């Protein structure tokens, strides 16, 4: 009764209006699952391949080279033939069949988007067949921890058309007692931040992930606004105090790195100063270029002045030495997250563990391309004493799988955007629903989400 009888893929749109793939998996019993695959803008070079159409093919496709008709065809005409008749409850077998048939290191034959769509839809179908929630299906009876959210309130980098080079500035309501309370705290800060930006003459347009995207003079000004918003909202900017709200940064430094010079450049700020954009005419003596050691010193200044608890991709994906040195200095009191560095790949994570390049891994399902491989990576991270942060992508959909995944694996942290844009809110609403379902069994980690930091 749990045999797969039908797999159907469809080209749909993500939150940026770009094509992505939706997959349905149906069983003989009538149970079925559906999944939509996200897409990133700031991507690591070692990520599994997201298959897009060549502009010369699929001429009836309005989306040209951004289309995913080839991935859709691979699901409907190749992967479906491989999986019809398979037991939907055997997730690892389903994933292994696809991975082996693809036969490439980066899933370039079928496309990671095609394989992941089927993998996640199969998991949803399995949960539906057993009539249990997805988090229970994946995590079993121990799945009961809601994640501490990283809420992206100011966007920059590749996610916004503004003057801010670091990609994300986030708040983490560490002093909350429940997930519901963490959202309430974040909501208050978010709306007070909007008022403060408006009062200072800045726009409150939002970036890809729902955070505000103002033109500010430097990263310190961004952090000053966050500190004000936290205080005006009635909370304490702190990594440890009662009702404390901490700050997290995603620098996305691969986008700032010049391989030929070995330096990091604040490109957007440099352009704003060079072209004398309004408000930047008199900006002088601003350091714009950094070696790895200088960037470590810069982060050190920020950490000493602001309650920063987490920095993601502080260095480029090729700068293993920079990551390791930074971790050696700050790794006992700061969460140092690898995203582009490790791309949810257990083989690369193995090197990061050996070289002590970080103490936390960002987990993005589409970086590796299957549920089973994602679970393997998280298990490896936890065994090594690393925390794991479940993450969305900048090009999202209404799919809420990552919310269930965070609870299923008790990761304790999730990064899924701001408190605007339905594609982001959908995940928060799903987590509120899960917390309500778990009732008294629900656990919220708060400060304990950083269990592996000795000197926080």
From Swiss-Prot:
* Keyword annotations of the record: Cytoplasm, Glycolysis, Lyase, Magnesium, Metal-binding, Secreted
- List the active site: 209, 364
> What PROSITE patterns does the annotation carry?
ENOLASE
Pathway(s): Carbohydrate degradation; glycolysis; pyruvate from D-glyceraldehyde 3-phosphate: step 4/5
Q: Please write the reaction equations for the catalytic activity of this protein.
A: (2R)-2-phosphoglycerate = phosphoenolpyruvate + H2O
Primary localization class, coarse: cytoplasm
Q: Which residues bind Mg(2+)?
A: 250, 312, 339
Quote the record's cofactor note.
Answer: Binds a second Mg(2+) ion via substrate during catalysis.
Decide whether keyword Transcription regulation is in the record: no
BP GO terms, sorted? glycolytic process
Q: Is Metal-binding included in the keywords of this UniProt record? A: yes
Q: What EC number(s) are associated with this protein in UniProt?
A: 4.2.1.11
Q: Where in the cell is it found?
A: Cytoplasm; Secreted; Cell surface
Give the residues the record marks as binding (2R)-2-phosphoglycerate: 167, 364, 393-394, 415
Molecular function GO labels:
magnesium ion binding; phosphopyruvate hydratase activity
Q: Which SUPFAM superfamilies match?
A: Enolase C-terminal domain-like, Enolase N-terminal domain-like
> What's an example GO cellular component term for this entry?
phosphopyruvate hydratase complex
Per its UniProt record, the required cofactor names are: Mg(2+)
As for family, the record states: Belongs to the enolase family.
Q: Its function?
A: Catalyzes the reversible conversion of 2-phosphoglycerate (2-PG) into phosphoenolpyruvate (PEP). It is essential for the degradation of carbohydrates via glycolysis.
- The protein's name is Enolase
Q: Which species is this record about?
A: Mycoplasmopsis pulmonis (strain UAB CTIP)
